[in-house]
Every structure is written in C-alpha cells, then in structure tokens.
Amino acid sequence: LFIYGASGAAVEIYDLAERVNVLSHRYSKIYLIDDFEEETQYYGTDRVHFSSCERIAKEAFEFIIAVGEPSARDLLLKRIEEKGYQLATLIDPSAMISPTAKIAAGCIVNAQSIVSSNVIMEKNCFLGFHVVVGHDAHLKRNTVVCPMATVGGGSTVGENTFIGLNSSMKERVNLGNNVFVGMGSMVFRSVEDGDTVLGNPARVTKGNAEHKVFRK
C-alpha cells in the first residue's frame, strides 16, 4: 500500500492502514509517498517518491490519498488515475457501515464513524474520526468531512467540498462544489458552489475562488 502524503493526516492514515491490516493481512508493506522530501525512514516505514511505483507491477499495489485539502486530493487522484494505478478503500474496524451504503474506491472512513443506510460515497472521500453521515446522504468526489462533524440525512455534498471540525448539516441540505464549511458551523440552508460559510447559523462570508482550505 502506498499512502500519498507524509503529513499529520498521512501518519493517521498509516495507523488506520495498520489496524485494517491486522484483520485483513492485505498488505505486506505500507509506504508513505512524499515528493518534496528525500527518501528515508519516517514514522517507522519507508518514505519514497511517486516515481518509485514505476518499478513495481501495477496489480501488485494500491494507493490511498492522505491529504486533507480537497483540491489537492483531486489533483493527486488525477495523477494516480493517469498512471492506471489501483485505489484502496480503508474503513476502520470500529466504524459502523450500513450494508446498503455504497463506498467507492479511494475512500477513507476513520475510527468510530457512522455511515448510515443508503449513503453514497463517491471516489476519494475522507471521513475523520467520529463522523456521522445520515441515511440517503450523497457525498461526491473528494469530499472531506472533519472529526465530529455530522451530515444530515438526505443531504448532498458537492465535489471538493470541506466540512470543518464539529460542524453539522441539517437534513436535506445541499452543499455545492468547492464549498468550505468552517469549524463549528451549523448549516441549515443549502450553499452555492464556491461559497465559504461560518457560524451558527452558518452564513456566507466570502467566495473560495482559489478552492483552497489551508492557506499559508
């Protein structure tokens, strides 16, 4: 397994992969990928460059993206797909997943999260710790839902959208693409593409033309 990233999110996903591997014994080795640092030992494993994968048969490994910035997840996903590499799906053993939920390749579901009945999670979604996704919700590609957040039943979350720590969405609320929901926000109304919302109740503060959550 190659974990694309070597930041704080990546080491959390490394721990998740180890927990999954205890039960599944799927991976003989778990690597971290970081093209901006030298290849060396990091967090008890090998940190390598993306190009290292070219020396291994494509069917012999899988990728998972461990980056919390939705636009970066989208970029890395396209890079992986262009190479024809396979995506893993990592679901913590402690997560509660409905048998009717549909979780696509590349998705991450962290510890103690709940994915309820008839939920659809498209490719490359990321759920943090203790996230609740209500029945019939639809999370589109590259959605990131941070720890302790709740997505109400029947809601739709657009592509490349970020839901901050401890935020909540009312049922049947729709978030557009490239939306940023700030930490601790309570979303009672639908949000248009590219908007940033904050507060309780959540109000639009500004657009997100750069489609960036984490800015230097």
Predicted regions and their residues:
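Short amphipathic alpha-helical segments
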Residues: 14-17, 44, 75-79, 121, ...
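A glycine/serine/threonine-rich, flexible loop-to-helix segment
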Residues: 59, 188, 194, 208-216
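Glycine-rich adenosine-cofactor-binding loop
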Residues: 1-17
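Short hydrophobic segments within beta-strands
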Residues: 2-4, 33, 66
